[in-house]
Amino acid sequence: MPHYRSRTSTHGRNMAGARALWRATGMKDGDFGKPIIAVVNSFTQFVPGHVHLKDLGALVASQIEAAGGVAKEFNTIAVDDGIAMGHGGMLYSLPSRELIADSVEYMVNAHCADAMVCISNCDKITPGMLMAAMRLNIPVVFVSGGPMEAGKVVSPTDGKVIKLDLVDAMIKAADPNVSDAEAEQVERSACPTCGSCSGMFTANSMNCLTEAIGLALPGNGTIVATHAWRRGLFEQAGRLVVDLCRRYYEQDDASVLPRSIATKAAFENAMSLDVAMGGSTNTVLHLLAAAQEAGVDFTMADIDRISRKVPCLCKAAPATDKYHIEDVHRAGGILGILGELGRANLLDLSCGNVHSGTLGQAIAQWDVAGGAGEAAQTFYRAAPGGVPTTVAFSQDKTFLTLDLDRKAGCIRSKEHAYSQDGGLAVLYGNLAEKGCIVKTAGVDESQWVFTGRARVFESQEDAVEGILGDKVEAGDVVIIRYEGPKGGPGMQEMLYPTSYLKSKGLGKTCALFTDGRFSGGSSGLVIGHASPEAAEGGAIGLVEDGDVIEIDIPKRRMHLAVDDAELARRRAAMDARGDKAWQPLDRERVVSLALQAYAALATSADRGAVRDLSQIKR
């Protein structure tokens, strides 16, 4: 029978000092026999996805204590990728994932907590906490802050409501044909409420995937942050984690532990969902990283295999301007997509979860198109309120009807899929021997096979300058290199270059290839995560202006049309540069000691950009 971890610091005469300190936090005699549960919050006033979380830790804590536990809250850091985008701040985004994972481990292990409720929301916070949960392997429930409502403006031409998000503001601002007044209206309307950005961007993708893995409650990824019914997820999480504690520590039920739930089959289910919903390409990095922390052998080869058999069943911004996450919720949310995947025999329904036994049981209870009961039918009618606010649970609007149209609605059946090819794909070739990632859900089918000439940039900044300076033309393949985990360092997101290609009218006539990564808001023929990266000797570092690049998504091919002898000559010339080899020639970039430490241990994207501690020389 496992022992409560907290009793290390709460029991025995030799822990008198620790108990004295616990008493100073408010604990009483009767509390020392209860489970101590960490409420892992991530409130910050810097991030709209987290600005409303301040009081939600206390809400969860109240339910933990009502259920017989002791709640102790702490915060992690949280970086807003949108605010950090387009300048040196983006170098810190991906490395912050490792800091978050480490900080959760440090706090939970230092204080011998028995379990956790992880209150996350945005891009690196959910994966960082997920990595920590896999390391610690103690009972955990994830509950996120929820998605932002989509922005809305009325079209001056036809009076119809147009849905907006952050990316629209960026594209309009960079388009010289858009007036200052129109650009300002879009900017003021694009992000109306608290919550994670309203499309199928990285934050929402990850919060949806925690549902599929089995560590979050139904609705976690899709019910908007402002809706009153989201409060119930936080309250239920607080009560549920105490029950999970008792099952593990008092009944020796290890099935409730994260590593028991997040098996290889669960990661494959999550990836199947990701491919079906066209999730952010960043999710590939984060699932690979979490799987490594869990000790699960889940690799790019598994992702490639899944991407070849799972169709695209759901589209939301940026893949379409018709639907945002609030519309995915109305169509049945993540359990609705999982229900369609289940009917197509594309899931392992025996996988467990924290709330409903098995995935199959969860689908039976919550899949609104599969006969779920009145509670589910009501829950998925939760709608946006349409009032700008930073306050959680501040409105209770509902849709009049659900979107159950599986032929032409937001979520579709396999028979009526947006495409039988999935929403994400892994490409291989001499430009990416270990793979690269494209979000096919966001690529116009006319570009699935594309040949163009390389236009090479040694940094994101140079690429932005080149695009805005009209140095990129239709038919070009923009190459942005030395932006990988090690070469950046930090693997910057390329949202500005992809947005500016659209602003210049090149969104459907150019491609972009990088060893960096993309915001979930990027769309178009944009291919990232080139592995190995340029700084690790990847062939992307050998591309020259004018080289022919061949892209074939159906054949999963990424090819540099240069013969092997010429590539060998270029590689030898690069190696001959000695200490300057595999580095950008003329890039001015200040790299702090903290980022240098990350770069020294960072792996390429095919391994999730995790740190490789074997690189430490003793």
UniProtKB/Swiss-Prot annotation:
One of its GO terms (biological process) is L-valine biosynthetic process. PROSITE patterns: ILVD_EDD_1, ILVD_EDD_2. It comes from the Bacteria. [2Fe-2S] cluster binds at residues 122, 197. It catalyses: (2R)-2,3-dihydroxy-3-methylbutanoate = 3-methyl-2-oxobutanoate + H2O; (2R,3R)-2,3-dihydroxy-3-methylpentanoate = (S)-3-methyl-2-oxopentanoate + H2O. Its EC number is 4.2.1.9. It is an enzyme of class 4 (lyase). Keywords: 2Fe-2S, Amino-acid biosynthesis, Branched-chain amino acid biosynthesis, Iron, Iron-sulfur, Lyase, Magnesium, Metal-binding. NCBIfam families: ilvD, PRK12448.1. This is Dihydroxy-acid dehydratase. It comes from Bordetella avium (strain 197N).
